[in-house]
Amino acid sequence: MREPDFLNHFLKKGYFKKHAKAVLALSGGLDSMFLFKVLSTYQKELEIELILAHVNHKQRIESDWEEKELRKLAAEAELPIYISNFSGEFSEARARNFRYDFFQEVMKKTGATALVTAHHADDQVETILMRLIRGTRLRYLSGIKEKQVVGEIEIIRPFLHFQKKDFPSIFHFEDTSNQENHYFRNRIRNSYLPELEKENPRFRDAILGIGNEILDYDLAIAELSNNINVEDLQQLFSYSESTQRVLLQTYLNRFPDLNLTKAQFAEVQQILKSKSQYRHPIKNGYELIKEYQQFQICKISPQADEKEDELVLHYQNQVAYQGYLFSFGLPLEGESIQQIPVSRETSIHIRHRKTGDVLIQNGHRKKLRRLFIDLKIPMEKRNSALIIEQFGEIVSILGIATNNLSKKTKNDIMNTVLYIEKIDR
């Protein structure tokens, strides 16, 4: 194939349509060097600004010389290049994590939104076979994604439809360690695949076909389940056990960097079935939150050490506080205005709950903790609930409960109204 053929494929696929700056992961091997040649030659046609990034793994004598040569190559092409050196005990997993952390740093520094890698169809076959041998979940057998959004960046693999034999022989560096069988991927490439191809000469095509078929099923399930609210456990549990598992796995696809193991997935299932309330980190900076018949998985956000200070509102005054407008004795108009009888004789305190808080209901004092449990109020709502207090007594827990004084007491003491309107924060 000629270079213009690759350009036409890139344009047809629209890989760089949404991107002005792209970082190319440049290893120095044939695939990444040819991708460098295509992208640097056709920057104008692709309408991108190209930035190079290289990791020197320091595992071979030649690696420092290769780094120098790549610096020269970047200078000749008048392109910026960022280089980082790997240190510490080497493993495939540690090296991969190091590379992607470094690439993200480069993207943040340069304002690039696309990371381009030179993975090709042969890499795809090796990846699917590795995952199959390790016993991964079915959806992961679809292999490497052609385009993958991770956070605010997109990883693009424009060579995924091509085999290594499609690339012309150009200047590149040969990693002699690829011929050794110390690493799993090398054993797949050098030993297992050649043996399997003796049984089926089209074995690579067969593996790629299976990967594409699994991807089709995955996309179809996602589309068909689009109107199912998996986070609503009543809805989720209305399906069979098998369907529940598939729906939950499809839901987890929303978090590509979560990567739960089979054991962790089973644990999440068990928590959803058995716990009424639960909040705990699960993996990779995510937490599972369950509140009765609802659950969600989300990134752990930093929590403030303390709630906002208590607010004091005086008669004939208004204040906006935590998403509400409070108006003490000054009427507000509108259908959604909440009205709470209060006294004009003293100020109103608005705050969050404290240990030992009680509310008077039907003449009896009830601890807020017990009230929240009885009403099955989720923990997050308990912590964020606004309490309206006057004369040292709780008048109302906003949106949850109100102090139901006797009619005579209300008429004697409550001689004005606190108007409350929900507003945007």
From Swiss-Prot:
It holds the Pfam family ATP_bind_3. The keyword Metal-binding does not apply. Belongs to the tRNA(Ile)-lysidine synthase family. Keywords: ATP-binding, Cytoplasm, Ligase, Nucleotide-binding, tRNA processing. GO terms for cellular component: cytoplasm. ATP binds at residues 27-32. GO terms for molecular function: ATP binding; tRNA(Ile)-lysidine synthase activity. It is an enzyme of class 6 (ligase). The N-terminal region contains the highly conserved SGGXDS motif, predicted to be a P-loop motif involved in ATP binding. NCBIfam families: lysidine_TilS_C (TIGR02433), lysidine_TilS_N (TIGR02432). It comes from Streptococcus pneumoniae (strain Taiwan19F-14). The gene is tilS. Its EC number is 6.3.4.19. It comes from the Bacteria. It is found in: Cytoplasm. This is tRNA(Ile)-lysidine synthase. GO terms for biological process: tRNA modification.
